[in-house]
Amino acid sequence: MKHCISKGRMLPVLVFILTACQQVNSPQNSGVIHTINGPVKVDKLKFTFTHEHLMSNFGKDPDEAPQYDEAALLSQVIPYLRKIKSLGVSSIFDCTAAYFGRRVDLLKIMADSTGIQIVTNTGFYGAADDRYVPEFAFRATAEEISKIWIEEFEEGIDGTEVRPGFVKLAFDDGMPSEIDKKLFRAGILTHLSTGLTLAVHTGNNPEAATEQLKLLTQYHVSPDAWVWVHAHLVEDVELLLSAASSGAWISLDGAKESNVQEYINKIDRFRSQNLLHKILLSHDGDGFPMGGEIREFDAIPRHLIPAMLTNGFTEKDVDQITVRNPKEAFMIRTRTTD
């Protein structure tokens, strides 16, 4: 991936943007998150994975009404979710977006069958060379797009009473495209109207992160309303520490058994800067990837947490990252700087 701005120059740019922001929270819907089964107080979230896919058709053609072998899907995913729940997990944020597999009716069956609180999303996925961005979005304004997402928040998704708990967006590699920036502006407008947090697939792309932070500043929205998704891919941890120190949420969402030590080392960098309160952990797993076998999402409770506890982290540290941080990151409220 080529970048036109060096990472050495990117860090002061991020610092300049972020230090200009001072967060002001509005009381709108404060203390609440929308789950598949309705609004709940954030205190009920408990141990939470903030970036998983319970099913997806990612890789297939875009589809506004995705089809699955529902019997096969449910017979595979529900037992696995029961296993996840037995490991102490109470809540999962499902990041499968519209046009590549979101089906809130199936998510409700999963939630009702397992007791896991599932949170779905609104928004469009702008990565994968914009493959899953609907054609009309290229012609529409940011305001017109935001109205669709705000309507899902106010009225429900796909004719149901299910409302989104966050906005899912994504940037391609390299310099941000016009459609990616427009979708992000639509996301900001949605946040200002609804208080939903913006979870944005950004990865190891400092240019995209900087552009997003510039736009947040232009609209007087705090970085605390923004999650840097797939941040574990970022090579320069100083960029993440800089973003976190000014309020942004850092999603380390590629955990697996084979990278436990890498995760411990990275988390320890945040601890050394008193920034454990800005980390989110997950796996980016998938319960039914294009109808295939499960891409598992159990490494955090089975491998990472035990290793953390034998490497100097405390139960309080683990609770901060897996319980308290998701509540604070996704509690519905507008977060502005004026």
Question: What does each of the following model-derived ranges do?
Answer:
Residues 51, 92, 191, 250, ...:
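Divalent metal-coordination and catalytic microenvironments
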Residues 4-7, 17, 23, 30-37, ...:
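Mid-to-C-terminal alpha-helical segments outside catalytic/metal-binding sites
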